[in-house]
Amino acid sequence: MAQAQRQQQLKKKSFSPKMLVYENLKNNNVLRHFKQRFAQLDTLLNNPIWVKSPVIDLGLNKQHTADIKKTDSLYWAKTAHEQLAVNRHNGLEVTGQVYARPDAYFDSENDDAEQASKYKAKIQAELGWNIINSKFYQGKEKRNKVALANELSRLQGKKRQTADIYEKAADDLTEQYNFYIGTVIAHRLDNLDIMNEAYQYMLEKDRISNDKMLKVMNEKLEAEYDISILCSDRDISNKPIYRMKPSKVLVDTAALWRHIDEESIDARIVMVKEQIADNDSKLSNYLGTTRITPFARWSSYWQSNNKISNNGDVGVRFTFPIYNENPRKRKALETEKEIIRSSRNTDVKEIKQSVNILLKRIENLNQAIATEAYHINQTSKYIDMRRFAYKNQKQGYNYLMRMDEYTGLLESMERMYKLMLNRGLAIINIEKAVSIYDNNNIFKEIEL
């Protein structure tokens, strides 16, 4: 039941096309419709609703912010735990062994001195200090390795988490503009309905060619199609005329290029990758492949004569590889850094080329918007001037021509709103290309 009511409400709000073909038209009715529409348009144009251009809402929403903060805190906690593990790695290690010699139990023919030199079992414990594999050797680099790996994962995750904000911003901006564009088209459609009615009446009286009527009918069909696409689920009937304040967008290109080179997520990811390669290069050294372990050992022996003897000793245990692969590893890491830089330079070059195209488009749209704003201003003045002329025209005047004047003004407004929408979408495309989350410092909109 609730679903049926909801569908009924949507149906009431949705746009439905108007009559295309009229019958039994009368001259007085057609003229009355013209006069009513002229009066309505004069009232609407003299009392418009002034609105600012829709704002590009690109900032992260509350859910995005909460998710990113939670993920960041988890990465930072992970880094802290892993670095604490590195700091607790002091290199101390205890080893021990216990073993017996069964042959010592059966060999009883030897003299006491010889039996004293043999033993039935042995217990040995050793405390060693593995210096190289501890926090005391390159501890800073080992902690950096953990931190950089987590920072890279965090940035890559943040880039994935924020990937959809640009599509959402474009959809929101388009929806806002579509409402204003749709209301203008709806007013233009009201004009076309009356003109279509007049042309059909004139065609019935053989006072006009079929071409003019077909042209108006086609314009009417196109307008209805546009409304059905732009505002299919919104009620735009009987709306005021929304006058959007024309504006110009200024771009701080220096800040934009700086953002691409240094501040964007992609730039920070590349920076972290280079830092990882630098840090790995420091960790790749010959000493790091060796093993040097000072130790203290205590041994207890159960001799063949059933006596216990103890002894302790200290020493250094070491292992030195007879090969050294680290110079090649460092060269490989330097090559990897060059690959990262080369790939980044190529990406930046392509991004800047795309951005330059979009910047040129924004500049052209700024000029086109200024031109349309001038046309709207001049047409409005012309309509005001002609309104008094029509009132004083005692011999009558061409109603169709006057309706064309109003329709021309509406068409110019429609064009300007579409140009402003396209400019906003171009800005979003730039922000998407260079990973901008806040455009306040780079893009500035000023009223003309």
Description of each model-found segment:
Residues 2-60, 233, 245-263, 410-448:
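Acidic, low-complexity, intrinsically disordered peripheral segments
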Residues 142, 146-149, 153-228, 367-438:
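Charged, solvent-exposed structural "stalk/scaffold" segments
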Residues 30-58, 99-156, 192-193, 197-198, ...:
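A subset of solvent-exposed loop/turn segments in beta-rich extracellular surface proteins, enriched
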Residues 20, 27, 57-67, 71, ...:
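Amphipathic alpha-helical coiled-coil segments and their boundaries
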Residues 271-281, 297-410:
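Intrinsically disordered, low-complexity segments enriched in Gly and acidic/Ser/Thr residues
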Residues 61-68, 72-96, 101-145, 158-162, ...:
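A glycine-/polar-enriched beta->alpha junction
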Residues 43-74, 83, 105, 205-208, ...:
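Gram-negative and organellar
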Residues 200-204, 208-325, 339:
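Acidic, serine/threonine- and glycine-rich low-complexity intrinsically disordered segments
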